[in-house]
Swiss-Prot record:
Residues 84-93, 155-174, 244-370, 429-455 are cytoplasmic. It holds the Pfam family 7tm_1. This is Tyramine receptor Ser-2. Its main location: membrane. It comes from Caenorhabditis elegans.
Length: 455
């Protein structure tokens, strides 16, 4: 019964595709009789689409729909978060908006047509005009997604390598210009087949719709869409990683130097503190009756004194030994020296430096892991497709199975669904924004509890 149901669904889809194809062909033929020359691409040699096995049809359709849904939801959240959550309204996040827009367009205009082709048994039944639109949009949107990733990498590199100058240069106008350049380059790579740099007539002799296999265009588009951006991303992220490692070593060197200086200065500091206490206690003023406590602490030994007629109004932090002071009416005072433990409120500078060093190292390790994940995911998703894309025109016998080719194509599309997670969810501010968008009641409740817990 289930098999009959799926077969009937597939037959309904095929009939709908046939009607759409007929309308497109009629429209294109009507236009060609008035303005354009007719297309010399025979569509009569189409073979009837093969019937996909039931399990493959169901699992494949569900998988593709899940990928589309993840891409749409994830990238929509990124766009909404940047424009609605105040901490994310930063000019550098416009690169993420451009990336999300291109990935969202891939999910809306490109992926569904692949699903239709899959339901039709791997046959293209939508006509030549739709095929040309489909292949052009595919190249344009996927290239813009990849080039946006490259722009994000360059933005991070400039921000780390030359932070002062780039902070002044990174304005809204500058970022928008870079984004426009990304989309113009994507158009320059995707438009040539439309103006004649193609061999579509050879590819569309049968019921299929594929990218142009013209050798020069394949090399040009593969280099501009993937291999050059990949090279830029690898070089830039490696430089970022090296810069981070150098910063860690520099911080460690400074910490070690400050520890040595701190250790050498301990004895001198204690002597100066005691001497200063004796000097300050001897000072008097004409302002009779003014009492100013003077407490000097060095972390190991505390010297406490009181000058009844002091001209200095300053005091260092009070210590618990102040209650043991004794003073006389003639302006003199007794000084008690008492060994105390290190004040918990004033930790050792060396410990503070070590703590900061650990935090810095942890941040740099997380950044390095993020860089490694970004490069790995990008290469893993797109490298198989572009390797097969480049080899195909130069090796006629190296023909991939249709299912393998389809898997490579969808693996590249998966990158568009993973980008929101890599560039958004790994960021704490984006996680907070997503939580605020998806669970506003939980965020309000958490804020109320936090406010009620405060004294």
């Amino acid at each position: 019964m289930f098999r009959n149901y799926t077969d009937s669904v597939q037959e309904m889809v095929l009939r709908a595709i046939d009607s759409i194809r007929d309308s497109v062909i009629n429209a294109s033929s009507a236009v060609s009789t008035t303005t354009l020359p007719p297309l010399d691409i025979p569509m009569t040699s189409m073979k009837p689409p093969s019937i996909i096995p039931t399990v493959e049809l169901v699992l494949g359709t569900i998988t593709y729909l899940v990928i589309i849904a993840m891409t749409v939801v994830g990238n929509t959240l990124v766009v909404v978060a940047v424009f609605s959550y105040r901490p994310l309204k930063k000019v550098q996040n416009y690169f993420l908006v451009s990336l999300a827009a291109s990935d969202l367009a891939v999910a809306i205009f490109v992926m569904p047509l692949h699903v239709v082709t899959f339901l039709a048994g791997g046959k293209w039944l939508l006509g030549v005009t739709v095929c040309q639109f489909f292949t052009t949009a595919d190249i344009l949107l996927c290239t813009s997604s990849i080039l946006n990733l490259c722009a994000i990498a360059l933005d991070r590199y400039w921000a780390i390598h030359n932070p002062i100058n780039y902070a002044q240069k990174r304005t809204t106008k500058f970022v928008c210009i870079v984004i426009v350049i990304v989309w113009i380059l994507s158009m320059l790579i995707s438009v040539p087949p439309i103006i004649g740099w193609n061999n579509w007539q050879e590819n569309m002799m049968e019921d299929s719709c594929g990218l142009s296999t013209e050798k020069a265009f394949v090399v040009f588009s593969a280099a501009g869409s993937f291999f050059l951006p990949l090279l830029v991303m690898v070089v830039v992220y490696v430089k970022i990683f090296i810069s981070a490692r150098q910063r860690i070593r520099t911080n460690r060197g400074r910490s070690a130097l400050m520890r040595i200086q701190n250790a050498e200065g301990d004895d001198d500091y204690r002597k100066m503190s005691i001497k200063r206490a004796s000097v300050e206690s001897a000072r008097t003023s004409s302002r009779v009756g003014e009492k100013t406590p003077l407490v000097i602490a060095d972390g190991q030994t505390t010297v406490t004194t009181l000058a009844a007629h002091s001209t200095d109004g300053g005091s260092l932090p009070k210590d618990e030994t102040t209650k043991h002071m004794k003073y006389h009416n003639n302006g003199s005072c007794k000084v008690k020296v008492k060994d105390v433990k290190e004040d918990e409120g004033n930790p050792n500078p060396t410990a503070v430096l070590r703590k900061r060093e650990k935090i810095s190292v942890a941040k740099e390790k997380r950044a390095a892991k993020t860089i490694a994940v970004i490069i790995f995911v990008f290469s893993f998703c797109w490298l198989p497709f572009f390797v097969a894309y480049v080899i195909r025109p130069f090796c006629e016998t190296c023909k991939l199975h249709a299912k393998v080719e389809q898997a490579f194509t969808w693996l590249g599309y998966i990158n568009s669904s993973l980008n929101p997670f890599l560039y958004g969810i790994l960021n704490l501010e984006f996680r907070r924004a997503f939580k605020k968008i998806l669970c506003p009641k939980a965020v309000l409740e958490q804020r109320r509890r936090r406010m009620s817990a405060q004294p």
